[in-house]
Regions:
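Alpha-helical bundle regulatory/interaction domains
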Residues: 1, 62, 92-100, 122, ...
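Basic, helix-initiating cap at the start of DNA-binding domains
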Residues: 1-27, 31-40, 57, 68
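Short hydrophobic/aromatic patch on the recognition helix
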Residues: 41-52
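Hydrophobic alpha-helical connector segments
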Residues: 61, 74-104
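Short, basic, alpha-helical segments at the C-terminal edge of helix-turn-helix-like DNA-binding modules
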Residues: 64-72
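Amphipathic alpha-helical packing segments from all-alpha helical-bundle domains
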Residues: 71, 107, 116-144, 149-154
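Secondary-structure edge/capping motif, primarily at the C-terminal ends of alpha-helices
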Residues: 74-81, 109, 113-116, 163-171
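Hydrophobic/aromatic-rich alpha-helical bundle segments in the mid-to-C-terminal region
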Residues: 107, 141-189, 196-205, 209-210, ...
Length: 217
């Protein structure tokens, strides 16, 4: 049945964005097309083109919204109260894991491994602006404005990204390897923020990782 003869109720924006993310997870960023998104959203291509200037605008909106959602979730850190610096690092660890285990990130790692890195590292993109603002507000905001904060923010971003955008490609990750990976990242983040690498507060809390919450405990 053609797009013009199929009469269905239009989906909400949230439904279309979720369908876009599902299409990206299934087909990767280069192959996910309007037809895939429309099918998953139970609508037609006409509706998509009427509401978004082009497929790239839809993908940008969907992925940016998901990034903001994950970064918001990352701030909800369970466990005992930590010193401010250690808490900031734990928030970054949680954000890293949420991204690393996201199906869209997994698809991008398989099909376009450099695309996500470029999108977040390039200063002119909305994803970079979002990540940078989040880091300066919740991770490096205690540092003086100017070169010191900018240097630390860039160090945290470039240190965490390879972990966040390099998910396990084959099957579930071994729990021991996973814990070791996040301990290494934690140590590097301490150095980025000028904190002792052998911080006892963080060492105790990065020994166990919860698959249910996607966060270090």
């Amino acid at each position: 049945m053609s797009d013009f003869s199929r009469h269905i109720a239009p989906p909400g924006m949230a439904t279309v964005y979720r369908a876009t993310l599902d299409a990206l997870a299934q087909y990767g960023p280069r192959r996910a097309g309007v037809a895939h998104i429309a099918r998953l959203a139970d609508t037609n291509r006409t509706f998509i083109y009427r509401n978004w200037a082009d497929p790239q605008a839809l993908i940008r909106n969907a992925t940016l919204g998901e990034l903001k959602h994950l970064l918001q979730l990352a701030r909800d850190v369970p466990g005992p109260l930590l010193p401010p610096g250690c808490l900031a690092i734990r928030v970054v660890l949680r954000a890293t894991r949420l991204l690393r285990e996201h199906p869209v990130v997994g698809a991008m790692a398989r099909t376009e491994p450099t695309l996500a890195h470029t999108a977040v590292l390039r200063p002119t993109t909305v994803w970079h602006e979002t990540a940078w603002q989040w880091l300066t507000e919740h991770v490096t905001g205690h540092l003086p404005r100017g070169p010191e904060r900018n240097t630390a923010t860039l160090a945290v971003l470039t240190t965490a990204l390879p972990y966040a955008f390099t998910p396990p490609l084959e099957g579930p990750e071994d729990a021991t390897e996973q814990a070791s990976l996040y301990r290494r990242l934690s140590t590097s983040l301490h150095l980025c923020l000028g904190l002792p690498a052998d911080c006892p507060d963080c060492t105790a809390t990065t020994k166990t990782w919860s698959s249910a919450t996607g966060a270090p405990l």
